[in-house]
């Protein structure tokens, strides 16, 4: 039997909402200390509900909820403010971040560092920062925080440190392996420079080559861990932007 509990004053972000019954919502949230979970907001669609206008994506909230099981009951939600609204390209990028969290994070699995990375990404998008480096930073943080062991600084075959002047094939669920020439890599493995790997490890996406190569590498890795699940937000982004 699920243990019922009351959680108060929990920092959280709304990832997705769905209508439920006639007047309520199922709200998928990402919380600081409890990870991703589903809450039912009873009566949230009624005209005078305290939840109306509060349960918005990309806005920091404080939430109280109660209950056990797969879906808890949302008791209170309070807007914290301070976050610019996402519009245009930034809004599409935000939906992409949310879809990654929904499809890759298990429920009830806390990831406080990932929570901080998400908040940082949303803030940067809201401030009008160029989206590509913001997305790459978050994608990398997501894979690392979920325990996928993204190796960036050691050659997995030789054990030696990655060299900035070398070229590597990236073995999925392994790591970089040095190549004598870029054409030596198997066709299904991404090829990256050592400098790109070192830049990624340092969180530096300022070089154009690093930005381009990290995009390809992270896309391959994310697709692998998605296990064939499509990302609708990515499809829209690909149609509108080169992200």
From Swiss-Prot:
GO terms for cellular component: bacterial nucleoid. It holds the Pfam family RecO_N. Gene3D superfamilies: Nucleic acid-binding proteins, Recombination protein O, C-terminal domain. It comes from the Bacteria. Signal peptide: none annotated. Keywords: DNA damage, DNA recombination, DNA repair. The keyword Cell membrane does not apply. One of its GO terms (biological process) is DNA recombination. InterPro entries: ARFGAP/RecO (IPR037278), DNA_rep/recomb_RecO_N (IPR022572), NA-bd_OB-fold (IPR012340), RecO (IPR003717), RecO_C (IPR042242). NCBIfam families: reco. Belongs to the RecO family. Involved in DNA repair and RecF pathway recombination. This is DNA repair protein RecO. It comes from Azoarcus sp. (strain BH72).
């Amino acid at each position: 039997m699920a243990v019922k509990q009351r959680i108060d004053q929990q920092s959280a972000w709304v990832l997705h909402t769905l209508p439920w019954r006639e007047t309520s919502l199922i709200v998928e949230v990402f919380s600081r200390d409890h990870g991703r979970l589903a809450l039912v907001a009873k009566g949230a669609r009624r005209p005078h509900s305290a939840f109306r206008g509060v349960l918005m994506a990309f806005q920091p909230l404080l939430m109280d909820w109660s209950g056990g099981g797969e879906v808890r009951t949302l008791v209170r939600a309070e807007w914290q403010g301070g976050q610019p609204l996402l519009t245009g390209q930034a809004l599409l990028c935000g939906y992409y971040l949310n879809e990654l969290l929904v499809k890759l994070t298990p429920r009830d699995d806390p990831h406080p560092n990932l929570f901080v990375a998400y908040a940082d990404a949303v803030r940067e998008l809201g401030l009008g920062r160029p989206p590509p480096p913001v997305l790459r930073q978050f994608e990398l943080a997501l894979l690392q925080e979920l325990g996928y062991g993204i190796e960036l600084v050691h050659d997995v075959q030789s054990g030696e440190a990655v060299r900035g002047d070398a070229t590597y094939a990236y073995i999925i669920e392994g790591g970089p392996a040095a190549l004598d020439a870029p054409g030596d890599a198997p066709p299904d493995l991404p090829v990256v420079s050592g400098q790109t790997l070192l830049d990624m490890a340092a969180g530096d996406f300022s070089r154009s080559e690093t930005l381009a190569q990290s995009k390809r590498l992270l896309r391959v890795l994310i697709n692998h861990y998605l296990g064939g699940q499509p990302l609708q937000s990515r499809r829209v982004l690909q149609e509108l932007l080169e992200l």
